Amino acid sequence: MNSIFIDKNLLDFLWNIYETLYKIIKKAKNYRGKVVKKNKRLISFLGVFIMLFSFCFQGNVQADVNTVQSGKIKSGNVTVWEVGNVAKVLADVERLNLNTVNVPIQVDIPNVTSTNMVINQAQKQQAIILIQELLKRNIQVIVEPFPYIQQGNVGETEWNPSNINDFFWNWKTVILQDIFNSITSKYNVYGLKIASNFVNMEYAEGYWSDTIDFVRQQYKGNVLYQMNWWLTASFDSSYEAKFVEKINRPYLKKVDIVSIDSWFEVSGKRNPTYEEVKKSLFATTVYNRGQNVVQQLEQLHKATGKPVYFGGFNVPARELGLQNPWNPDVSNVFSKDVQLNGWRAYRDVLEPKPYFKGFSIWFIGSNDSTHAYQIHSKEAEAVINGWYRK
């Protein structure tokens, strides 16, 4: 299918017209009596223009999915609070040559020990609209029930339910069942993440095996289990033992794709060069740990027999961004080079690996142009755009 694109400058120009006319019509509608009668034709014309423009604006932005290698995932994560930014999501998909979008469904959780959870229905409806628009454009969708703990003030890795049995019962019957009923049974969803960085629950092997069976009964797409990134150190064998235990969980062999929230602490330098980053992927320099990230990814693949996928990944455009990539505010010194060198090194090392399924950029769809996780240079944009290009 041929994809149609609008020139960015023209798009920006039309969008400015759209916003201006929208403000005019909004003000016009506030008048009463004679003023409304006098402006009736103008209001009607502007209303038609806005509807037509909205159709053109969203209808012509399409993913050029034919340029991405078959079987690979080039994705972007949308945050739970930005699923309504449909136009920006689509623009980022085009700009970065993505073929997939990770759409979160907000799961409201009162506190870190809670076993009670509920899907936020208002956010879910926005997510469904985004899913519909993505599927219209042949963009694959991965659905992720995303833990939103204490109104988003606590990260999902902190979730430690007080009763593991109650947790799994509610995760299956309240959360996943809602997603089956309202999303996966109605839309062609490429993948479903059944877990997102549940470090305190991953030990429950029997429960996870049962959950996967439960999911398979109602969903025929790709099942993903997402684990959190890990540390090892050459001077402490206990880290290695935990890693070996992690990758040998039996339930990992039952999913289709093993996903990693990938924030490996690679380089302790403020501004490492491309060559330094590349070398550090085989022996990390932060605290001289010597972690061989590339080798461990291969170990994970061999242990599970499954493709490995970076379900959340980026390099913040900050000095020390490769020391603590999970922290967008690791430094207040902006650095496009750190982001570029990180993306280049990861691409050059992982793109040739047949077991590596792909990646999802954390994040897309945001209008915060200064955020460290935005892609801040044309050079970094080109690296991402070209990854897995046919």
Question: PLM features: residue spans?
Answer:
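Aromatic-lined substrate-binding rim segments of carbohydrate-active enzymes
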Residues: 90, 103-150, 202-225, 281-288, ...
